[in-house]
Amino acid sequence: GVRRFYIDYAQKITLRRAKTKLEAQAYASDLISQTAQELNVSIVVLAQVGRAATKNPNGRPEAVDIADCDNWARDCGQLAFLHRPAIDDFHPRNEFGIPLGRDGQPLRVTPAEFLVRLNRFGLGEADVKLGFYGERGAFVSPVLE
């Protein structure tokens, strides 16, 4: 049977009975968490990070940065972020805006990270270095320089 469900873009969930977006998000988060437990399935919910995350001291998103409602972080069993640091922090760009490597050639893979910030079922936090292969829209590992 089905063991995993995916919900793309949590902030698009709306409920007619909710008076505010925050109320709708809090209710949806709780309902999804309960449903996962009752059906004994994993429900992966993709959510947007608020703009304030870019102002974090380390430049990385944290649980409090999930846009519109922090209930998502409280109700989940695992919380992870795919993060692509600002490329300008690492590499210059050519006249077309494409990042360049040390050899002056366009980069095919740019820096990225998979950040585990909560894991109630495992080892806890982790930072995994990845690369983002833009031509294919894929995250790859390990990062080769």
Regions found by a protein language model. Name each.
Residues 1-2, 19, 31-39, 52-145:
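C-terminal regions of RecA-like/P-loop NTPase motor modules
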Residues 2-45:
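Helical hairpin unit composed of two closely spaced alpha helices linked by a short loop
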Residues 12-14, 50-54:
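Short, active-site-adjacent cap segments at secondary-structure transitions
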